[in-house]
Amino acid sequence: MINTQDSSILPLSNCPQLQCCRHIVPGPLWCSDAPHPLSKIPGGRGGGRDPSLSALIYKDEKLTVTQDLPVNDGKPHIVHFQYEVTEVKVSSWDAVLSSQSLFVEIPDGLLADGSKEGLLALLEFAEEKMKVNYVFICFRKGREDRAPLLKTFSFLGFEIVRPGHPCVPSRPDVMFMVYPLDQNLSDED
């Protein structure tokens, strides 16, 4: 189970490597008051942390998948999906891989053009290459577009996750939907 005790939906929103300074002031020290992770030479001595590394997992003419390697083993992996809709338009999805499940956080605001194609490519990749058992999507229940999102994702095959599901955190303010992947059927093809 993923630990999400703060205001974010998934740990994806809390990852220090994805956060940037909130107070940008001109000058050479514009980010001096922001906390920075300690740097450490891999394999070296010291109490610092290794910076996150990103690895290319997959690339074809439309889909690029990269993964932020965690600093410590046992932590969830952050996976980035970029689907090229056109030469100038890209659909991007960020997800967390944990315990044979992929958690995709739906960003606030309107979904970009091409998001459906990007999500379908993500689902296909998750099933065929990552061999996950479930793909979960999550978004805040208070969204104004909640009803259209539920309808859209239900049409794509997602089901609403009931409270208390063992794979999702207890978050009353967050709606979870799941797309179960039956790996037994895909292995027989």
UniProtKB/Swiss-Prot annotation:
Chief location: nucleus
> Which PROSITE patterns does its entry note?
ODC_AZ
Where does it reside? Nucleus
Single biological process term from Gene Ontology: positive regulation of protein catabolic process
- What keywords were assigned to this record? Nucleus, Phosphoprotein, Polyamine biosynthesis
Superkingdom assignment: Eukaryota
Q: Name one GO cellular component term.
A: nucleus
Alphabetically, the GO molecular function entries are: ornithine decarboxylase inhibitor activity
Please give the InterPro entries that the UniProt record associates with this protein.
Acyl_CoA_acyltransferase, ODC_AZ, ODC_AZ_sf
Q: What this chain does, per the record?
A: Ornithine decarboxylase (ODC) antizyme protein that negatively regulates ODC activity and intracellular polyamine biosynthesis and uptake in response to increased intracellular polyamine levels. Binds to ODC monomers, inhibiting the assembly of the functional ODC homodimers. Does not target the ODC monomers for degradation, which allows a protein synthesis-independent restoration of ODC activity. Involved in the translocation of AZIN2 from ER-Golgi intermediate compartment (ERGIC) to the cytosol.
PANTHER family for this protein: ORNITHINE DECARBOXYLASE ANTIZYME, ORNITHINE DECARBOXYLASE ANTIZYME 2
UniProt lists the family membership as follows: Belongs to the ODC antizyme family.
Question: What does the record note on quaternary structure?
Answer: Interacts with ODC1 and thereby sterically blocks ODC homodimerization. Interacts with AZIN2; this interaction disrupts the interaction between the antizyme and ODC1.
Q: What is this protein called?
A: Ornithine decarboxylase antizyme 2
Organism for this UniProt entry: Homo sapiens (Human)
Give the taxonomic lineage as stored in the record.
Eukaryota, Metazoa, Chordata, Craniata, Vertebrata
What gene name is listed for this protein?
Answer: OAZ2
